[in-house]
C-alpha cells in the first residue's frame, strides 16, 4: 500500500504474497504457449527456470522428444540465467 502526496511517495507498506495471486485461475483458460508470459512473472530473476518447468512437464507427460540441439541450448540458457542471478547480488 502506497501513500502519495502528488508524485512524492510518503509511505510504503509492502504486503507479501500477491505476486502469484490468481495465476492458477488465469491458466485455466489458456494454452501453455499463451500462459508462458505469465510464468515469467513468478520469479523475475529466474525466468528461464520457470519457463523450463512449465514446458518440460507437458513434454514429459506426452513423451515429446525435443531435438538434442534444443536441449543443449536450454541447458546453456539455464546456466546463464543462474549465473546472472548470482551476479545480481554481488
From Swiss-Prot:
Matches recorded under InterPro entries: NADH_UbQ_OxRdtase_49kDa_CS (IPR014029), NDH1_su_D/H (IPR022885), NiFe-Hase_large (IPR029014)
GO MF assignments: oxidoreductase activity, acting on NAD(P)H; quinone binding
Gene3D superfamilies assigned: Cytochrome-c3 Hydrogenase, chain B
Localization of this protein: Plastid, Chloroplast thylakoid membrane
Presence of the UniProt keyword Repeat in the record: no
Recorded topology in the membrane: Peripheral membrane protein
GO CC, any one term: chloroplast thylakoid membrane
Record keywords, A-Z: Chloroplast, Membrane, NAD, NADP, Plastid, Plastoquinone, Quinone, Thylakoid, Translocase, Transport
Family, similarity comment: Belongs to the complex I 49 kDa subunit family.
Function: NDH shuttles electrons from NAD(P)H:plastoquinone, via FMN and iron-sulfur (Fe-S) centers, to quinones in the photosynthetic chain and possibly in a chloroplast respiratory chain. The immediate electron acceptor for the enzyme in this species is believed to be plastoquinone. Couples the redox reaction to proton translocation, and thus conserves the redox energy in a proton gradient.
This protein's name: NAD(P)H-quinone oxidoreductase subunit H, chloroplastic
Organism: Secale cereale
Source taxonomy: Eukaryota, Viridiplantae, Streptophyta, Embryophyta, Tracheophyta
Gene: ndhH
Amino acid at each position: 500500500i502506497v501513500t502519495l502526496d502528488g508524485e512524492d511517495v510518503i509511505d510504503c507498506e509492502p504486503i507479501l504474497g500477491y505476486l502469484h495471486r490468481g495465476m492458477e485461475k488465469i491458466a485455466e483458460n489458456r494454452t501453455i504457449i499463451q500462459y508462458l508470459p505469465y510464468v515469467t512473472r513468478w520469479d523475475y530473476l529466474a525466468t528461464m527456470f520457470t519457463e523450463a518447468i512449465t514446458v518440460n512437464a507437458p513434454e514429459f507427460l506426452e513423451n515429446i522428444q525435443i531435438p538434442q540441439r534444443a536441449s543443449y541450448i536450454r541447458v546453456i540458457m539455464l546456466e546463464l540465467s543462474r549465473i546472472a542471478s548470482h551476479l545480481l547480488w554481488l
